[in-house]
Amino acid sequence: GVEEAAGAIGWEVRVLDGAGSIQGRTAAIGQALALQPAGIIINGFDAVEQQAALEGVVNSNIPMVAWHSGPKIGCDAPGGIFANVSTDAMTVSEVAAQWALDDGGTEIGVVIFTDSTYQIAIDKADRLKETVEAAGGTVLEYVDTPIADTSSRMGPLTTSLLQKYGDSWTHALAINDLYFDFMGPSLAAAGLAPDQGPQAGSAGDGSEAAFQRIRSGGYQTITVAEPLNLQGWQLVDELNRAIQGEACSGYITSPALVTQAGLEKLGDSNQFDPDSPYRDAYAKIWGK
């Protein structure tokens, strides 16, 4: 979305990879500073974790916007961030937890997966837990495992949790779709068909892989998707506002509960992209 929008506004974009580690993210911010750009977009970096590095950006007077930098969304986010673009993360968690409750009733046994590296992930997982328990459901375990290590950890974790909880484990809720990229093989190895084992639901973000699992009846039942492409356009718009000395828009996008039935209506698309003329609207704002 950012690259598409940058093409429309006429900007050059350089992508720097944080490589899924704290050190990598710090290094990427340092590289960005060295380039002396007109603006910086922080994509999925925790502002608290990277506070020292972000202070360098602020001290250099380089405008900065972010996607999912922390729990506070919208204008004037912590860390000197002009705007933090996101859906309301608490709403996303509530929608995912309510799906599990609607699906299994108050007899559900939930395992929640999160990553304490990110404050927003902690807050989302806490809201999942609060919502399930407030309705009378049971949270069997609250699992803290790094998103960056899901490929190596989720298989053994899934096997261990199945052995520990058996049929009591009815639903798996995670703060991100990535956790379910690597859960299916362990469930299959345990002899569980997709409709038999713990039903998986994600409180964000609506990846293509998740859409494909949901569409095909794989080992994920729902996700609560964000309009990621639209948010890319909003990031460019917010950064343009910062560069021009204008006010932040304050716009907050709405999430969508994505189910197999809903995807059938979408056709072949594996992306939640709202049917609205947002590209034309932003281009008009930019005078393009």
Can you annotate each of these PLM segments?
Residues 1, 5, 9, 14-27, ...:
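Extracytoplasmic "Venus flytrap"
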Residues 1-8, 92-96, 119-139, 153, ...:
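Short, solvent-exposed amphipathic alpha-helices that sit
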Residues 7-18, 109-114, 129-151, 196-199:
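Short beta-strand elements in bilobed, periplasmic/extracellular small-molecule ligand-binding domains
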Residues 13-36, 143-165, 180-183:
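Structural motif
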Residues 25, 83-110, 122-123, 152-155, ...:
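Hydrophobic alpha-helical segments within soluble ligand-binding/sensing domains
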Residues 42-59, 128, 147-213:
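Hydrophobic alpha-helical
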Residues 48, 52-91, 207-216, 220:
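Flexible loop/hinge segments that line or gate small-molecule binding clefts
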Residues 135, 227, 231-288:
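Hinge/cleft segment of the Venus flytrap/periplasmic-binding protein
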